[in-house]
């Protein structure tokens, strides 16, 4: 049985009012060598895609000056002087997302507007999310471009990723191989490595939060979004949260956890990328069965679904899904593995037939537009994540079934020279997906 509890947010300092400095815009370079590049068991965005409104055009007559929104709030002139604000393209429980174009560059972004009246008493949760977004700057992470805080609203100019999500990329392609899956993991592991170098744990890595960025040369890369559950790791964490299919055993066991819960989630995603269904599956809506499987950590590669998948891929998945946290791979080790750095990929590439199984198992369907997934991720806030925070009512044998007690998480030294101001593009030893 599960009961809902509130996220243990860490109150931070008040948001700057306003912040006039602008973070560097995402690099428009299109590297030809980039790697491909509610609480249901599988989860999804808290914002319903079916209700997302998509704007195909903007009013060309819009000029600088304070604008009144259809939702009844005034968009500050500080925003409208720099951005042409368009129609509402997403409407979540606590935030509205509007199309916006930077006037000086014609670059398209998304303006996320959080109405403070809906957040009373829980402001610290929003502050924690924004404080994380301020710190992160990486090619494989959805960026916060600029922010402005006024008494009644918080305005966030966000990078708008328009290529759909990870499942969209797989189900819409005509050819899909291990090399494609390897490239996707390269992008994800690069983002995780960077976050962990800052001692930030994401805690909700799943396909719906991995968005496809399409470069001008036709290559693609993944960007990780939705930092509503992200937090700084300065000691063991105990809040039981996440999306059940991707949650690590140490979270369920409530023994304390750290950064490597993100590696477990990435391992589950890698498994899905290669066969179309997750390694741990419950029966119907019985999450206890799913959690018991996760606690046991027995990973199988059933025939015929895995017959044409390389042993190198299976070995890597096993190392990412180790119940023993000390033995589980880090993001650095994932990136160094032959299957990811190209040495372990098979020469004869078999096409993987996973799209149909993904559609069936995850009940994925067509979205209103390719932008819908990116808008949905932006529309989600930390407050929406309260549904994904749960406490397991321990049975007497929970810890007994959890065979490997994790060591207290250490402050990680998986550093990479990506400062928050870096706009370097992650390059891969492989072809793009």
From Swiss-Prot:
Compositionally biased residues, Low complexity: 40-57
Keyword Nucleotide-binding included in the entry's annotation: yes
Modified residues (Phosphotyrosine): 213
Enzyme nomenclature, EC number: 2.7.11.1
Gene Ontology BP annotations: axon extension; axonogenesis; brain development; central nervous system projection neuron axonogenesis; dendrite morphogenesis; forebrain development; negative regulation of protein localization to nucleus; neuron migration
Domain Protein kinase: 83-340
GO molecular function, a single term: protein kinase activity
Residues forming the catalytic site: 204 (proton acceptor)
Record field: compositional bias (Basic and acidic residues): 388-400
Entry keywords, A to Z: ATP-binding, Developmental protein, Differentiation, Kinase, Neurogenesis, Nucleotide-binding, Phosphoprotein, Serine/threonine-protein kinase, Transferase
Ranges for region Disordered: 1-74, 388-433
Enzyme class: transferase
Residues that bear Phosphoserine: 23, 25, 27, 30, 40, 45-46, 48, 57, 69, 419, 428, 431
Protein's UniProt keywords contain Chaperone: no
Family: Belongs to the protein kinase superfamily. CAMK Ser/Thr protein kinase family. CaMK subfamily.
Function: Probable kinase that may be involved in a calcium-signaling pathway controlling neuronal migration in the developing brain. May also participate in functions of the mature nervous system.
Protein name in UniProt: Serine/threonine-protein kinase DCLK1
Species in which this protein is naturally found: Rattus norvegicus
Gene: Dclk1
